């Protein structure tokens, strides 16, 4: 019988890792999934992703993207809704630590998941803030980025402007050449250090929704495949639908909820509660 990897076991975070996430707006966690676990999910994610990626060829695009694959594949559903990933997010945003003793644990909901594949020689991913897109009225929304293959620096792993989440919303600008230029100047002016490093398949980063981030070009002849999942605390309300992307996201990923509504549609399963 083929072994099933349901990601139900816990990944234990140190206080240092939790403090680093809150201070820097991102944290790197090694081997969140083991090599066997990554192999178990990679085949299904890759197969469903390639079936759903846009067919039109565009050599200038920074990545191939398709969302909510979990409704096409049980394995992707298992991955995105896994207790392990939900518990990590809960610990990062709510677990009491010595310097923050009054924080309480809380439920964590999924916003959406997506496959992001950067093709060989694919261009850089411009600097941007995810929460420009996410209509979530919280500063505790969290994005997971996990490579499904080993990603050396030449392949374009994710990179972060450390500490940039503390600015919150910066500007109404979507991911583009314009956002790359604007945020690069902003990063330079604020003198934010840039974090990036090579990652193994199954390693993961978690980042705050306001953390400025992007990725360099894929200079290799291999596809950089990664899985992204976005989570937020239960009790969050829908934020202002202040741009077309937020209108679209509320429609497709929050079940048509409107500004001020609780973000608790049937699409937004609670993946962890304590």
Annotate each language-model stretch with its function.
Residues 106, 131, 136, 146-157, ...:
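Active-site region of the double-stranded beta-helix
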Residues 106-108, 112-113, 123-125, 140-146, ...:
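Generic beta-strand structural signal
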Residues 151-212, 236, 260:
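Double-stranded beta-helix
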Residues 1-24, 29-127, 133-135, 173, ...:
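Non-heme Fe(II)-dependent double-stranded beta-helix
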Residues 123-130, 138, 154-160, 169-173, ...:
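A short secondary-structure junction signal
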Residues 130-141, 192-193, 199, 222-223:
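A short beta-loop-beta micro-motif enriched in histidine and acidic residues
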Residues 6, 51-55, 61, 204-206, ...:
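Non-heme Fe(II)/2-oxoglutarate
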Residues 129, 177-190, 223, 242-248:
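Short, surface-exposed loop/helix-turn segments at secondary-structure junctions
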């Amino acid at each position: 019988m083929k072994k099933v990897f349901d990601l139900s076991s816990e990944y234990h975070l140190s206080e240092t890792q939790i403090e680093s996430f809150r201070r820097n707006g991102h944290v790197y966690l090694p081997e969140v999934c083991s090599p066997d676990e990554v192999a178990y999910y990679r085949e299904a994610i890759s197969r469903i992703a390639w079936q759903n990626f846009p067919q039109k060829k565009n050599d200038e695009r920074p990545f191939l993207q398709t969302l909510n694959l979990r409704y096409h594949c049980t394995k992707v559903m298992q991955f995105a809704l896994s207790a392990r990933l939900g518990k990590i997010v809960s610990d990062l945003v709510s677990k009491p630590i010595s310097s923050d003793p009054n924080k309480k644990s809380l439920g964590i909901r999924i916003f959406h998941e997506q496959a992001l594949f950067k093709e060989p020689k694919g261009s850089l991913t411009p600097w941007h803030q995810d929460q420009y897109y996410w209509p979530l009225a919280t500063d505790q929304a969290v994005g997971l980025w996990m490579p499904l293959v080993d990603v050396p620096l030449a392949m374009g792993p994710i990179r972060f402007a450390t500490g940039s989440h503390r600015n919150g919303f910066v500007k109404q600008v979507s991911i583009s050449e314009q956002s790359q230029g604007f945020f690069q100047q902003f990063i330079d002016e604020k003198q934010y250090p840039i974090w990036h490093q090579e990652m193994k398949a199954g390693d993961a980063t978690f980042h705050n929704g306001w953390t400025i981030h992007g990725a360099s070009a894929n200079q290799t002849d291999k596809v950089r495949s990664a899985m992204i999942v976005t989570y937020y605390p239960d009790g969050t309300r829908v934020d202002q639908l202040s741009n077309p992307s937020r209108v679209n996201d509320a429609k497709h990923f929050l079940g048509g909820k409107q500004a001020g509504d609780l973000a608790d549609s049937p699409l937004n399963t609670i993946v962890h509660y304590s």
